[in-house]
Amino acid sequence: MSHTNQPDLVLYHAWNSSASRKVRLCLAEKGLTWQGLVIDINKFQHHTDWYKRINPSGIVPALLVDGHALIESNLINEYLDEAFPHPPMMPADPLQRHEVRRWSKYIDDTCLPAVQKPNWSLLMRPIAEKWSDAELAARLAAIPSRERRDLWTRMARNPFSRAEIDTALDILEDMTRQIGVYLAKSGGPWIYGDRFTLADIAAAPYVVRFEEERPGHLAAPVAAWWQRFLARPGWAAAEIGGFSADNDRSVAEAVPDSGIAG
């Protein structure tokens, strides 16, 4: 769907970032035109002063709307649904909207910390474990978030064990079971019934990573939901590939180190 008189949308993102993938999916499902500027997390562009002026949290994504910065992927997607209401991606009923928000919060509170364990172990550990104490201290000084500072310290000095990663994947598997519960309750074909919503989008980046780590572990109703999702035009338009391949793409397509003004 085309949107007349849409504002200028600039998305700062990384191809393999789960939160960035959520926003790209929403932009794609809305049929919006946007400019993408890729941040190379491996080179810590998200911790640079110029990027922290856009997103003080020093994380991706950030969406500029006519130059106004929006942050936090769930909040960005709710803005997009309110600003561009067709097709709608939130239920009309306030109680059902609450359920979608509750699901999205569960994803952020539970599944994001879980997926960080395999993701960071794969990509960040090889970088961080080479740092001297002085290099680690310098990197940590540029990171606004205490949680992220703790993660980088963990990667550098006490990386996640195989058991911790397996427990994290168990959490993601439980998320897929919860999708099955919602599908059974709503009757499908989507998490909250016949309408594709932000709840489906919130889960998708975590399902794709779970499928990469534990292929073939989706229960039949969830696997059918997932195939329906993959068949949507928005999935192809969001350009979600393999985790490592998308990391390489972010490295190749990153903005200059000096940054680009939105």
Protein language model annotation of sequence segments:
Residues 31-33, 51, 144-155, 250-257:
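Short alpha-helical hairpin
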Residues 87-92, 114-115, 189-194, 236-241:
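Short, hydrophobic secondary-structure boundary micro-motifs
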